[in-house]
Amino acid sequence: MIIDVGEWVLRQVCARARTWLDAGLLPMRVVVNASYRQLNRGGEYFDSVARILRESGLDPQRLELDVTEETFLTDGSTAVRTLRTLHELGIRISVDDFGNGFASLIRLKNFPFASIKIARSLIHHVTVNPDDDAVVSAIIAMGHSLRMSVVALGVSTAEQVTSLLRHQVDLMQGYYFSRPLPVDSCTRLIQSPRLPPVRTRIGVP
């Protein structure tokens, strides 16, 4: 079931992204989750992704696949080999919910990930727990040192935004900016983006 659903989701997302681009909306990248089970299908999954991109007319560089830390725990696994071939096609690969699993930093360094996405559980307490704040700061610094962009997941308050800006995070995602939207509402948001107020001036002691 997850294989069929995953393929359907990818096809719908790629087709919608192509429609937005054809309508002259801002160049964008769409993100789809890829499960370990899907990636472990190897060439069959790669062929499916390549076919969907070809049918939709979407440039592979406009697609990003999110994977969990478990996906690259074993060097040389079918899943890791599949990720490498997808990366060679031009697709961006990112680590989702980083900080929740047991990823080896060596493996993180050795794979050309485009970005790491900090787990919601760490972001949730970033303004109230100094230890979480320190871990988030360290992850952002590490990601930048490895030439990756860093995304904060689950951002829900202005205070979290201010803290993450201070740590120089690249992107933020969460209910503070928008709840999940149906396609029509999402299209209107892309056409006329309205972001909530953010205190962007960071005080210097």
Question: Model-flagged regions — what are they?
Answer:
Residues 165, 181-205:
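C-terminal helical cap(s) of enzyme catalytic domains, especially alpha/beta-barrels
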Residues 131-135, 177, 182-185:
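Short acidic-hydrophobic sequence patches enriched in Asp/Glu that either
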Residues 50-126, 140-180:
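The catalytic core of metal-dependent phosphodiesterases that act on cyclic dinucleotides
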Residues 44-45, 78-79, 104, 128-131, ...:
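Residues at alpha-helix caps and immediate loop-helix transition turns in enzyme cores, especially N-
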